[in-house]
Every structure is written in structure tokens, then in C-alpha cells.
Amino acid sequence: MVKSLAVERAGSSAIRDLLEITEQPEIVSLAGGLPNPATLPTDAIARAAAAALEDDPLGALQYGPTEGYRPLRRWVAGRHGLAADPHGEEHVLVTSGSQQALELLTRALVDPGGLVALADPAYVGALQALRAAGVDLAAIPADGDGLCVDALADRLATGERPALVYVVANFDNPSGSTLSAERRVALAALADRYGFWIVDDDPYGDLRWHGEAPVPLRELTDRTITLGSASKVLAPGLRVGWAVAPVEVRRAMTTLKQSADLHTSALTQQIVHRTLAEPGFLEGHLVTLRTTYQAQAEHLVGALRTKLGDRMTVPEPDGGMFVWAELLDTTADSAQLLDPAVAAGVAFVPGAAFGVERLHPTRMRLSYATADAASLDLAVDRLAGVIPAP
């Protein structure tokens, strides 16, 4: 049996394991944060692929620079407020999905045994990457306004010194919360005072349909590193993500990426750039995504409140892809409900999958992004047959 220390530390992702189960056609999955298939812009991607192979076949099919395709890096820099900087792309590293960006960043800035602070509950992929790197985790409470920055401040005051503070500031995964404007200012001030890096993982920021987005953390302190991805706004199968960071951090990550995979696929980078940079495409596509996900979110929340309102509380999302539902029975354990739910033909992610120190037994993450209205209704009917009535 082959099992290194890194494998043991990382563990298996509950969500990735569930995806294999939910590929079965009889199961309605509320588990993975997969884009709705109807929203995937296949025609635009096909045009971009054909253009890349016709206009620049060598650039699309040959080895490329580790930093990434320069036109894509310039586009990302512009989206992150660096359009006026003639060397803005020097802050951008293109990665094989934002998951690789987090893994490289952790290796670049935190030695094994170093400390990383993050909300509890936390994104499963982040937990895997951080644990595989052998860092220690400081679990910080979170609520409807995101990471409790005052609790972090208390930990800092006692002498704890995280190298990184990881947040999903816009529509946190799994909780769906957005870090409030006041807490962003406070977190930025703490970073400047204590010298840690803020890692703002932002795959969902463009998927907002209610309210105004708070000021990005990167505009509040230069100790912010922003991670982004084409997965949620274009297509996850292209596996293109990025990090926007101070140049010295980007260079350190580039060195590590050279030893990992040399560079992200040149062809998919060109496809992503040509698609996203096509005049008028992104604005129209984001309208489609927001309209679709808002309708699906409202449909799922309405169905859950109608059929399971006596058994769970369900918040109303303002964006993103998830509902962080809570069972009203304080003795319940959502992990114990998963096998019966799958047997009944519906899947979700138990709260325990997101736990840093706590298990969140009464919580479950439900994604409304993938399924259509009829499938969401069916999923709720099946859940109603599994979750005990009061």
C-alpha cells in the first residue's frame, strides 16, 4: 500500500468522492458546485478554439512560459484594477485552476508547521491543500457577515502569528456569506499591523444578483493575494485559474509551478482569453448566469421552506452557488443522513466535510446551480422522505 505523509494529511475530498456517486443518472445531486450545463457557452468556446488553432497553432500547441499566456495575464490584471499599470500582468500567474494557485501559494509563503487562519466552516479544497502542505490551522468562528475578524484579533493579541489568513470574501463556500465592509477594513488593518497575507479566494464574486459588493480586499491593503478562476464564469473543464499578487510573491509561485507542471495548457489559456475578451461576451454571459442561478436559488429555497420548513432553516442567497441549511433538530447529524439520502436518489454535502475544529452536524450544503427546477423539486421530495419529521 502506497501512502505518504502528505496523502495522509490531505485526506480525500468528500465532495470529489460524492461526484463519482452522483454521476449515476438516477441521483439528483445538490452536492457539487457544478455550473448548470445549459449555461456553458459551448459555441463561444468552439469559436475561440478554432481561432486559436487557425491564427496561432504554434502558440496554442507548443510549450509556453510558466507565468502564463501574456494576453490572458493582461486581461486578468485589467479586471483586478491594474489596467493603468503598464506592467500589470507581472502581478498575475496563470494556474491549472485556482486550487493549484492556493497550493503553490501555501508552499511559497508557509513552511510546514507554520500557521494559517481561516473560517470554520471552510472550503473543502482549501482544507485539503493546506493540510497536505503540513501547516497548522487556526479555526476562526464565522457568521452571516463572514469571518469574525474580532475573534481573529483576539488570537493575534495573544501572540498567534499566522502567515496567511484565508477567506472566501464573496459568497463563502459553504456558508454563502459575504465578508462585510466593516470586517474587510478591520481585516486589512490587522494584515498591515501584523504582517500576514490575506488570501482572498474569489470564484463567485461575479455571481451576485442582490446588493452591492463591498470594496475588494485588494483595494484596502497591498498584503492581499486574490485567487480567481474561469471555472464558474466559463467552464471548469478548461482548468484555468490565476493568482494576482505582489510581484515577489508571484515570482516565488512561478518557481514552484515550474517543478509542478511547467505551465498551464497553452491551448486552454488561449481559449479562455479569446472567449472572455470577446467584446460584449462576458457582460451578456454574466447576465445569463445571474438570472439562471437566481431563479434556481429562489426555487430551491422556496421548495425547502414549503416542504421542510418545520425541519430546517434555509437562508436566501444573494449570489454564489450554495445554501447552507441548518436542521432544527439539535441532536441531528447530517452525515448520518447522507447514505439514506443517496439510496433515495438525492445527494448533499454534510456539514462535517467543512469542519476545521467543529463538525457542524446540523448543517448541510445544498447547491442549486446544476439542476433545473423539476430536478430541484424531485430532490426536495426525496430529502423530505429522509429527514425525520419533528
Outline where the language-model segments fall:
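N-terminal small-domain helix-loop-helix segment of the aminotransferase-like
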Residues: 8-97, 104, 278, 347, ...
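Conserved PLP cofactor-binding pocket of PLP-dependent enzymes
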Residues: 27, 203, 342-365
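Conserved core of the PLP fold type I
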Residues: 59-194, 205-223, 293, 322
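Active-site PLP attachment segment
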Residues: 206, 219-252, 264-267
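Structural signature of PLP-dependent enzymes
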Residues: 253-258, 278-302, 330
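Conserved glycine-rich beta-strand-loop-beta hairpin in the small C-terminal domain of fold type I
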Residues: 291-301, 313-326
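Short, conserved charged micro-motifs
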Residues: 331-337, 374-378
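PLP-dependent enzyme catalytic core of the Aspartate aminotransferase-like
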Residues: 343, 358-390
